[in-house]
């Protein structure tokens, strides 16, 4: 919910920072959005190894407070380059949702794992759907900078909740033999199906995420210049 609030307001924030043309707004928004996910792809294996050694709870806490700080810093930027830089740093500390999945999968009784993961997916989807709408409304009501501050506070609250209420019975696993790709294929009968699913998910993500940096810019270009509640319309 907190993170998805930013989807409709990030391009408009660059306009407030002095980026005027639609092309430049789309470019900066694409850089800021893509920077985070690019870094996430690069550092995810590293954080995964840390989680395997230290537990998943520490990953939740690190990600929550790290993203909270990043969003608070974005609220005080005065140039587009500063926003992109902090979004790069945000990618370094991300990983909340993936850590949540592994934590639930490892801590929930086996007969309740499907139910728990389904509940988590429903909560994540609900937040993703409602977040842009509320984020756009808040941006029009209290200002984009204050919206970033609010997102930072929400992420900080999630960190506090993770620290206080999540209890993990984690025991590091003994060192296991590293599998080659050929051995991995032998152990997973449906390996090719999993690869196909990953490719399909990759294509789906490209289609969805390619629109996120430009949808607000597109709407700004087709509505009258004096239109109020532009962020709310974009979020809807």
Where is each model-derived feature located?
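Residue-level signature of mid-helix packing/kink "hotspots" within the transmembrane helices
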Residues: 37-45, 95, 128-129
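Loop-to-transmembrane helix entry
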Residues: 20-35, 224-236
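Conserved MFS/SLC helix-loop-helix module at the cytosolic interface between two early adjacent transmembrane helices
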Residues: 41-78
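Symmetry-related core transmembrane helices of the 12-TM Major Facilitator Superfamily/SLC fold
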Residues: 147-164
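Hydrophobic core of transmembrane alpha-helices in multi-pass small-molecule transporters
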Residues: 70, 81-95, 202
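Pair of pore-lining "gating" transmembrane helices in MFS-fold secondary transporters
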Residues: 1-16, 191-210
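Juxtamembrane intracellular "pre-TM" segments in multi-pass secondary transporters
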Residues: 168-197
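Cytoplasmic helix-loop-helix junction between adjacent transmembrane helices
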Residues: 86-124
């Amino acid at each position: 919910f907190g993170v998805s609030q930013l989807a409709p307001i990030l391009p408009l924030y660059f306009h407030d920072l002095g980026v005027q043309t639609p092309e430049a707004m789309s470019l900066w928004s694409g850089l800021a959005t893509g920077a985070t996910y690019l870094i996430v792809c690069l550092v995810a294996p590293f954080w995964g190894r840390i989680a395997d050694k230290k537990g998943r709870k520490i990953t939740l806490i690190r990600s929550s407070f790290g993203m909270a700080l990043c969003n608070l810093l974005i609220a005080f930027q005065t140039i587009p380059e500063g926003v992109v830089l902090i979004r790069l740093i945000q990618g370094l500390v991300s990983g909340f949702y993936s850590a949540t999945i592994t934590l639930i999968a490892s801590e929930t009784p086996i007969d309740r794992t499907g139910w728990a993961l389904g509940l988590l997916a429903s909560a994540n989807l609900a937040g993703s759907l409602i977040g842009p709408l509320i984020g756009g409304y808040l941006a029009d009501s209290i200002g984009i900078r204050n919206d970033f501050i609010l997102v930072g506070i929400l992420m900080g609250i999630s960190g506090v909740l993770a620290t206080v209420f999540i209890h993990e019975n984690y025991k590091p696993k003994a060192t296991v033999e590293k599998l080659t790709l050929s051995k991995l294929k032998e152990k997973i009968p449906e390996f090719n199906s999993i690869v196909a699913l990953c490719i399909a998910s990759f294509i789906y993500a490209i289609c969805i995420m390619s629109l996120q940096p430009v949808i607000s810019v597109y709407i700004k270009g087709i509505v009258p210049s004096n239109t109020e509640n532009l962020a709310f319309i974009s979020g809807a």
